[in-house]
Amino acid sequence: PPRSTLFPYTTLFRSLMVVSGGRIIEVGEYSELSAKFSSEISIVHFKDSLIMPGFIDSHIHYPQYKVISSYGTSLLEWLNKYTFVEEQKFSDIDYAARVAELFLDELIKNGTTTAMTFCTSHKQSVDVFYSAAEKRNLRMIAGKVMMDRKDRKSVV
């Protein structure tokens, strides 16, 4: 069977995925690859399991983790009533780190391994986010939010 993302609807049965340094280096028939790598690898057998790639989230805000589903009649009302209040707490590096850990654990629980993530305007929110992501071997693109209107001085 084809072994490429050019054939996305292909299912491999009785196969082996060889991972080194957190990266997939080869995928193929179990009988072929287990012989090829027999002295180099330890095998973890996921019998009767489905192995899939991690999901990619192209737009997510980690500082809004604790205000998910908060009610607002408009975007500005929601930002002022919940989001900005929550985001100003990220000036505390310990708070930002705790939320980063919770947020990333939730992503992993739901199969997301890569994300384009918005942090807050506080530099430390980005630093602790990357530290937590690195500990979990996640692939993240992140940066601090920039605002130039309708902002609160406490979050810039």
Model-predicted regions and their roles:
Residues 1, 5-12:
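Short, small-residue-biased leader/transition segments that mark boundaries at the very start
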Residues 54-58, 115-117, 140-144:
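Hydrophobic faces of well-ordered beta-strands that scaffold small-molecule active sites
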Residues 92-104, 126:
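Short, acidic/polar
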Residues 124-156:
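Metal-coordinating catalytic core of metallo-dependent amide/deamination hydrolases
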Residues 66-96, 149-154:
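Active-site gating loops and adjacent loop-to-helix segments of metal-dependent hydrolytic enzymes
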Residues 10-52:
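Histidine-rich, glycine-flanked metal-binding segment
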Residues 107-115:
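Short, surface-exposed connector motifs at secondary-structure boundaries
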